A protein has these predicted regions:
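A residue-level marker of the well-folded mature domains of exported/periplasmic proteins
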Residues: 1-114
């Protein structure tokens, strides 16, 4: 539906969705927020292989390098300034200086501050 709307830009979610945003000679995807899972999957598979896997619910965060966004030239339509600001915010998330609202940490949209 977004492709059919005129002048619309979107941000993809979970994986790089740039290819999905192709719309004639333009693209509606500015960037995509990513779940970065390759390291986690690799580590868990090694735990299974060596017998140390203990199974548990784990919440991965920026501090685990489990989140990110597409900034690769040609797949991202953000300005250099926007990318710099997102990188700065990502660093604050990793340091715990920004704690986003979530259903597991008691922070709500109403109580969120930074």
């Amino acid at each position: 539906a977004a492709k059919e709307a005129e002048g619309v830009k979107v941000i993809g979610c979970d994986v790089d969705q740039y290819d999905d945003g192709a719309n004639g000679d333009s693209n509606i995807v500015l960037t995509s927020g990513l779940k970065v899972m390759h390291d986690t999957v690799y580590n868990v598979l090694n735990e299974v292989k060596d017998g140390s896997f203990k199974g548990a619910n784990v919440t991965l965060t920026a501090a685990d390098d489990a989140t990110g966004f597409v900034s690769e030239e040609g797949r991202c339509q953000l300005t250099a300034e926007a990318i710099e600001k997102i990188n700065a915010a990502q660093a604050l998330l990793k340091e715990g200086k920004i704690v986003p609202a979530a259903n597991f940490n008691g922070v709500t949209p109403e109580t969120f501050t930074w």
